[in-house]
Amino acid sequence: MHRSPLAWLRLLLAAVLGAFLLGGPLHAAETAATRSPAWAQAVDPSINLYRMSPTLYRSALPNAQSVALLQRLQVKTVVSFIKDDDRAWLGQAPVRVLSLPTHADRVDDAEVLSVLRQLQAAEREGPVLMHCKHGNNRTGLFAAMYRIVVQGWDKQAALEEMQHGGFGDEDDMRDASAYVRGADVDGLRLAMANGECSPSRFAVCHVREWMAQALDRP
């Protein structure tokens, strides 16, 4: 049967549209099926809120409407990596606020170890939420290093979660990814276990310790 060029064009467009409509659900199903159950689980996508463990959550900057949810989650401490005052949205909610402003493009090992220790200390008092502005770069960096140093994940597994866990575009996490890729995992774990401020003996924090000790000598 002879078909006009217009008819063939209509058939082609219908085929392309059908493939697109079918491909979307299939891709979504494939993504859901391949997402590791060990990765942080979504709680409230509107603020990029995810549950990393029973005592640790991560998110973008929350708002006043988030307070009721955080109270249901029994969050006791909010750790912020930005300069904004969390009391602006928390109000008088009975939540401890810990302000640790950082920059993912120039974070160092001493800062990472300090944050990890403060997260662990806060977790002993109850669930903790850590956040930055968008919940992917600064928060992603500390979440990945928590996975690696505290929970014992390997570097690649932590990077996979960071980049494909649904927290944002991979391009938005370039600084965090660069730090994680270059991190001295063994050195950080050893320093964490030994209570040292940095894996490097020449880090500024160690120099300060030496100077303080020297000044204390009679």
Swiss-Prot record:
Asked whether the UniProt record includes Kinase among its keywords, one would answer no
The record's subcellular locations are:
Periplasm
Entry's InterPro entries? Prot-tyrosine_phosphatase-like, Siw14-like, Tyr_Pase_AS, Tyr_Pase_dom
- For the protein in the UniProt heading, the enzyme class is hydrolase
- Name the catalytic site residues: D105, C132
Record domain Tyrosine-protein phosphatase: where? 44-188
Q: Keyword annotations for this protein?
A: Hydrolase, Periplasm, Protein phosphatase, Signal
Main site of residence? periplasm
Catalytic reactions on record: O-phospho-L-tyrosyl-[protein] + H2O = L-tyrosyl-[protein] + phosphate; O-phospho-L-threonyl-[protein] + H2O = L-threonyl-[protein] + phosphate; O-phospho-L-seryl-[protein] + H2O = L-seryl-[protein] + phosphate
Care to name a GO molecular-function term for this sequence? Answer: phosphatase activity
* Enzyme Commission number(s) of this protein: 3.1.3.16, 3.1.3.48
Database matches in PROSITE patterns: TYR_PHOSPHATASE_1 (PS00383), TYR_PHOSPHATASE_2 (PS50056)
Query: Per the record, GO CC terms?
Result: periplasmic space
Q: Tell me the first and last residues of the signal peptide.
A: 1-28
Pfam families (UniProt xref): Y_phosphatase2 (PF03162)
Physiological role = Phosphatase that regulates diverse phenotypes in P.aeruginosa via regulation of the concentration of cellular c-di-GMP. Acts by dephosphorylating the membrane-anchored diguanylate cyclase TpbB at tyrosine and serine/threonine sites, leading to inactivation of TpbB and reduced c-di-GMP production. In vitro shows phosphatase activity toward p-nitrophenyl phosphate (pNPP) and tyrosine phosphopeptides.
Q: What is known of its domains?
A: Adopts a canonical dual specific tyrosine phosphatase (DUSP) fold, similar to eukaryotic DUSPs. Conformational changes occur upon ligand binding.
Can you tell me which family this protein belongs to?
Belongs to the protein-tyrosine phosphatase family.
Write the protein's name: Dual specificity protein phosphatase TpbA
**Organism for this UniProt entry:** Pseudomonas aeruginosa (strain ATCC 15692 / DSM 22644 / CIP 104116 / JCM 14847 / LMG 12228 / 1C / PRS 101 / PAO1)
